């Protein structure tokens, strides 16, 4: 019997949860010569949603995670590798030979792909410009390539003025749709919404929200009904109350609940035992994370774990409090809705359980 919940990887097909309105909006927008910017906290399902859109659009696609790009040359090599996956090497050899800096190609028999490498001390800007130009040159005007740049805010750390150079190239391209994904809201907003930014209003801006509770209730009910029986309604409510409809944590907790319903003999405290299992399972990870915070950050996290609002923590100076919250939010440990809250509900339980 297969677990009907999936998390930690791209969620697709039967595991994909709702997002029908967002999916249709993305597909309509990318049907024209337009670009898309999507911002949301980590693990809200941006990558899964875009993967679903690409699957349904059936267009050539290049998907790059910019967290893996440690330099402009590395980003160029990533673009090359993705291009080689799309186009047979014999068809693009001549095009590659016309680049200002021709890469050295190597074949990886393990995955059947070609990779590009460049000589040491190569001109990084030229190499990257060539790679970005290739995206346009090799794209079919009748079947435009969609280029997804995940965690795009990371690009700012690769080189001075890289945003200006990329914008100058991309704005001239007619055969590519760019999709920019990012989880650091303040940085992404600065890149695409500040008037002086090179990427100001470069595409449609979408803020991906949590999945509506009604939709998640239906999704969970359909998948828990067989195992939970008349307990289904109470379990669904408990799961969503705990996770706040966060896509990742909802699937994670529901998965453990389902496992316990199906495989455990004692079903008297299924929900409580599932939560305890998740907290215990991540105990070492949470401890390492906790030790990485300074004292002020720990005090704030303890307050949030006790459901205190930020403005109630008057034992900390206002500037100190909000500077620390801003850093925690930037790194994804805290998210801001109506109030600040700890992003991981099970980390919240871990903190509360040790705060006494």
Label each residue range with its predicted role:
Residues 32-35, 39-44, 48-145:
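P-loop NTPase nucleotide-binding core
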Residues 190-241, 262-265:
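Helix-loop-helix "sensor" segment of P-loop NTPases
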Residues 1-36, 41, 89, 356:
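A short, basic N-terminal segment
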Residues 236, 259-282:
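Conserved C-terminal helix/linker of AAA+ ATPases
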Residues 236-242, 248-262, 299-302, 326:
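C-terminal helical "lid" of AAA+/P-loop NTPase domains
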Residues 118-185, 193:
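Conserved Walker B catalytic segment
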Residues 2-3, 276-356:
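C-terminal leucine-rich, beta-strand-based interaction scaffolds used for sensing/assembly
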Residues 56, 165, 256, 327-331:
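Alpha-helical DNA-recognition elements
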